Design a protein with these regions (language model features):
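Short, flexible loop/turn segments at beta-strand junctions in immunoglobulin-like
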Residues: 332-337
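N-terminal, active-site-proximal structural segment of metallo-dependent hydrolase catalytic domains
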Residues: 29-100, 112-113, 264-270, 275, ...
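Metal-dependent phosphoester-hydrolase catalytic domains
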Residues: 32-34, 133-134, 166-168, 176-186, ...
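Short beta-strand segments enriched for Tyr within beta-sheet-rich domains
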Residues: 291, 301, 338-347
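Conserved small/polar residues in nucleotide/adenosyl-binding loops
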Residues: 433-435
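N-terminal active-site segment of His-dependent metallophosphoesterases
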Residues: 33-59, 67, 283-286, 294-300, ...
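Active-site beta-strand/loop signature of hydrolases that rely on acidic residues for catalysis
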Residues: 42-49, 64-88, 155-158, 174-201, ...
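Structured beta-strand-rich core segments of catalytic domains in phosphoester-bond hydrolases
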Residues: 56-57, 81-154, 246-247, 322
């Protein structure tokens, strides 16, 4: 029973960890899958807070913080923010909001004002990698663009001029900065431009509006105009998909309502696979190929007796391909005993899966592996059996060192290799350790 993958030692594909997924309680497994499926999803918010002064002329940062907490964004672009001014009683407004929302504050002053500064800011769940700010035109008031880099994306915040000419003069600067980005870039803020204005028409040539311009944001009590926007840079391709957009019904805390959008960032091909594929159930002229991905995918197996003439296998139930999940299980059938087969697995990310709209990302393709089903005359085989590892890597290292050079047909990881896994990530724990 020769079931081997291409020069891939046993300890580089810990199938025992993955097999334990089946032992998880269903609700825990589903909850964990949902969490992993959303790992690339980003909730973006933009809010002109008028320094916390509401439609009732009461300044209350608690209301602003509560409006943000209700949305639970990953990142917020904030406009009209005081920093230790007399008007704000010497308070660092953005830092105060950061403390109340448990988010990192990043500030960009636009002007000196009342003994302190006045400008824009950003709140983020993730600590920024770097930030800078760039001056923008504004004849009635100086303007600024706040550029903040995170691990996977760049987010910019600005409050554009009331003057149409200055807004148009800002466009080349916005385009220049966006073109220099080496990650997906988003920009948000109060742009002081209505949905059908020349500025929105022009910026839409390079940026995709992610918020809904048909939903009014100003004035907050009875909004009749959209002045607040979130957009993504798409001139060099679209590395994300918009999932949803809305305007929360916050009518009092500020004179603007916030805008919110959710996007999913595309995974790079090398980020799609969780670990190498593994084989199960080599019976009745067939074998099952299984593997996991970090993101929802449409997946298939390509296989054949050589690497040039390949068949494609998928899992089909009632005429429909099973997809849009993280766990892939595909059965190869009509195989000949004693014949060596080559195979590789392919997974294409599903960015959006709706009844009438589907969007796809990149495709990951594994190297070729091989397996040979046992022939009818084969009676002998070699198996490696491990017990009671208790997630102890040094023990696995030592045991593997004793059998490193033994050609084996399959591996059995018996009881207590992982102690009572609480969730899927724990069950998959060792499959990521490439010792």
């Amino acid at each position: 029973m020769n079931i081997n993958i291409r020069s891939n030692p046993m300890r580089k594909w810990f199938i025992w960890a993955i097999v334990l997924i089946g032992c998880l309680p269903i609700n825990k497994a589903l909850a964990q899958q949902s969490g992993d499926a959303e790992r690339n999803t980003l909730r973006i918010m933009s809010y002109n807070i008028r320094n916390g002064r509401g439609m009732d002329e009461v300044t209350d940062l608690g209301r602003i913080a509560e409006a943000i907490r209700k949305v639970a964004p990953d990142v917020v672009a904030v406009q009209e923010v005081d920093s230790v001014t007399g008007r704000s009683g010497g308070i660092d407004v953005l830092r105060t909001l950061g403390e109340r929302t448990l988010m990192f504050p990043t500030y960009a002053p636009a002007i000196d004002f009342d003994g302190g500064k006045y400008g824009v800011g950003m709140l983020s769940k993730e600590k920024p990698v770097s930030y800078r700010y760039i001056a923008l035109p504004g004849r009635e008031e100086e303007r600024v663009l706040l550029w903040v880099e995170f691990e996977r994306y760049i987010f910019c915040c600005t409050h554009l001029s009331l003057t149409p000419e200055d807004r148009m003069l800002s466009l080349p600067i916005l385009r220049r900065e966006a073109a220099s980005a080496h990650k997906p870039l988003f920009i948000a803020g109060d742009w002081n431009a209505t949905a059908h204005s020349p500025f929105i028409t022009e910026i839409s040539k390079d940026f995709l509006l992610l918020s809904n311009p048909k939903q009014a944001t100003f004035p907050a009590s009875t909004p009749d105009s959209c002045l607040d926007y979130i957009a993504g840079y798409v001139k060099n391709g679209q590395p994300f998909t918009r999932l949803s957009a809305w305007v929360p019904e916050e009518a009092v805390a500020s004179d603007h309502r916030p805008v919110v959008t959710e996007v999913r960032l595309k995974a790079k091909p090398e980020e799609i696979f969780y670990a190498a594929p593994y084989l199960q159930n080599p019976t009745e002229g067939g074998i099952t190929v299984m593997w996991q991905t970090h993101v929802p995918t449409y997946s298939w197996v390509e296989y054949g007796t050589d690497t040039l003439n390949l068949k494609k296998a998928r899992t089909i139930v009632d005429g429909q391909v099973i997809c849009n999940g993280l766990h892939n299980k595909i059965r190869l059938t009509d195989l000949r005993p004693g014949q060596t087969y080559y195979y590789r697995v392919c997974s294409r990310e599903i960015m959006l899966y709706q009844a009438y709209k589907k969007e796809f990302g990149e495709t990951a393709v594994s190297p070729f592996y091989t397996f040979t089903l046992p022939s009818a005359s084969q009676k002998d085989f070699t198996a490696l059996i491990f017990n009671d590892l208790h997630k102890h890597i040094p023990t696995l290292d030592a045991l593997y060192g004793q059998v490193r050079d033994i050609p084996y047909d399959f591996v059995v990881f018996n009881g207590d290799c992982i102690d009572d896994p609480a969730n899927e990530k724990e069950a998959l724990y060792l499959s990521l350790i490439h010792i």
